[in-house]
Amino acid sequence: MANLKSLAKDTAIYGLSSIVGRFLNYLLVPVYTIALPASGGGYGVVTNVYAWVALMMVILTCGMETGFFRFANNGKDEPMRVYSTTLFTVGGFSLIFLIIGLAFLHPIAGWLGYEEHPWYLGMMMMVVAMDAFQAIPFSFLRYQKKALRFASLKLLFIFLNITLNLIYYVRMNGHDVGKAFLINLICTSFIMVCMIPELRGFKYVFDKELNHRMMQNVRLFSGNEGKKMV
């Protein structure tokens, strides 16, 4: 009974933080719509860039947060070894993505139609790399059943993001589209600093054999999900 109560409590916290987060983020839509000039692309620039962000997040994490849960709970592999290996894998993917993205920033910006504002994409590449990496510590918090810590970090990002947007676009009457991406970068970086406790206190190891099994599991899971969608 105690386990059921704990599960119900954690589920409620995760669910509430997600619902509240989505609702608060929707509050930024009218702010952007009014503040961003249509001549510069307006809110369309923000939505277009964030669409690419969502796609790259899926590619970079490649289901490893789910794989971490599966292997950390299988009773065979040492959980902290799984966590460390997953951090190395996703961190490596994110770093490679960021290096290549910044190296070819101007060609990519031109291809996407942002040749005059390449750093819109540059800033969001940094955000994507950090967000993808942060997905693993967030999964680790769920594994540890630290629902309050999980929710507090998620909501802290949202409140900080909304506050800075309101200060610039409403209080200061700003109209620069790029500031929306800069604010996101600042908030994401702040959360990364807040996650330092989840990134220390254990031995960092990269288990090649474990990583191979995890990647196989991810490919198998992705393949099965793909078949369901067809």
Predicted features by range, described:
Residues 1-7, 148, 174-181, 193-230:
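Interhelical loop/hinge segments that connect adjacent transmembrane helices in multipass membrane
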Residues 55, 99, 113-137, 152-155, ...:
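Alpha-helical transmembrane segments of multi-pass membrane proteins
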Residues 33, 109, 142, 169-172:
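Helix-capping/transition residues at the boundaries of transmembrane alpha-helices
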Residues 6-65, 94, 98-102, 161-162, ...:
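Signature of the first transmembrane helix
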Residues 96-114:
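Short membrane-interface helical motifs at transmembrane helix boundaries
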Residues 4-5, 33-43, 56-90, 142-149:
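Transmembrane-helix boundary and interhelical linker motifs in polytopic inner-membrane proteins
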